[in-house]
Structure formats: C-alpha cells, structure tokens
Amino acid sequence: MQKRRDDMQFQMNTGSDIHGDRHLVDDAEKIVTAALGHLAHRLSRLEVHLADVNGAKGGADDIRCTIEARPEGMKPLAVTHSDANAKAAMHGAAKKLRTLLDSEFGKLARR
C-alpha cells in the first residue's frame, strides 16, 4: 500500500504471514514518520517491509522489519530489526534508520 505525504512517498509491504490491513499501515506510517519526521524534507520515499521469518512456527523475535529510505541525491539506505511483534520491530528499525540518516547527513554537512 502506498501513500504520499507532502513530497515523500510512503509504501508498506508485508509477507504472506502478516495481514497488512489499514490499521497496520497507519501504525507503520505513524511510527516511522515520528522517528524520521525531522528528515522528511530530505527523503523522497520510505518503504517498510514486514515479514514473519518463522511463519506458523512462531518463536521469539521472529517479526522482521526492514525500512528503506531514499534520500534526495543519495543512494538508498536500509536497516533491519527483528522483534517479538510488528510494532516493536517497526520502532526498532525506525530508530536504527534515524541514527543512520543523522550520521549520513552529518557526514555530508562536514564536507
């Protein structure tokens, strides 16, 4: 499912074992934009991928969230975080991506 937020596109993809309903998409957008909102003007697209790596078998930390950001004028950057549920996985990945983007933009500013 794809949404447009100002100039930044937001896309959500789920694996076959995760039901990607409107509620999950809204949660994902809120979590990711809360973490990255201060950088939204520098991003053209965000893609969130959720997958249940163990499927029906279950298990601890088996929900994997990968978030790919496409910064304007740069190569795409991606992070992955696994956790016990979708929200926790999205929060973890969003935090990792915020740290990575802040670092990359900081490097550009120092040049």
Spell out what each predicted region is.
Residues 1-111:
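N-terminal, polar/charged subdomain of small-to-medium soluble alpha/beta proteins
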